[in-house]
Amino acid sequence: MSAAMPNTAPETPETPGAPDVPALQVEDLTVRFAGLTALDSVSFTVRPGTVHALIGPNGAGKSTCFNVLSGVYRATSGHVRFGERELTGMPPHRIADLGVARIFQNLALPPLATVEDSLLLGRHRLTRTGFVSAGLRLPSAAREERTHRERVREIAEFVGISAYLDRPAGSLAYGQQKLAELARALCMEPRLLLLDEPVAGMTADERRRTAAVIAGVRDSLGISIVLVEHDMGVVMRLADAVTVLDFGRRIADGAPADVQNDPAVVRAYLGERPDEPRGEETAS
């Protein structure tokens, strides 16, 4: 995986997933907190090797949905399935072991560690050498570390940050640190990426570069991506499918162009509400 970072994001082609990447199925997902309904019977399917955007106004339930997908929250009812595996109620570390990686909105790189060492942390679940062997620097441990570092360098080149591997992560510009976060997630060798506002706070150039990398992850690696993002330009360029939430309910689902013109979506973003009862507002 040593391809150079693409300059522009492709226009959402149909891309088959890698053979071992299953579909993610969310079925009738409901989450309640002390009587407040954060998600109300939400369903959608992420096809293998596609970018599926989850959008909606603030308070729509997007972050709650992400927290259920990654195991941080437990659903009140409903199911999340990754292929044949039931993720509902599974703890975060077990979900990660199935190849699900999440990137949070806030930066989480160790600021004083080098970028290379920060990325190496993403290889932790793939490490077979025990603490004793690593501490004694046995030949098997040294060989495994070399293999992991080679992989880290390949991924850094793919993402476009190989020039910064020897620098402290905290010294990088904000956009570069966000790319390093993405590279660290890729170091886990995921089959599904959960990206929570990956271009938030970036300059226009940084947004374009990051969108190009995300497109490359889908097109070159066949990894499925669930994307929460407020930048509708990025969503429309990247997403193969879009699910729209509003007050915890799914109000639209389909191709980006169709969803963009859906009257219910337009009303939600303009602040106009239909007359039927709605669920309670919670954190987005």
Tell me what each language-model feature is.
Residues 2-284:
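Glycine-rich phosphate-binding loops of nucleotide-dependent enzymes
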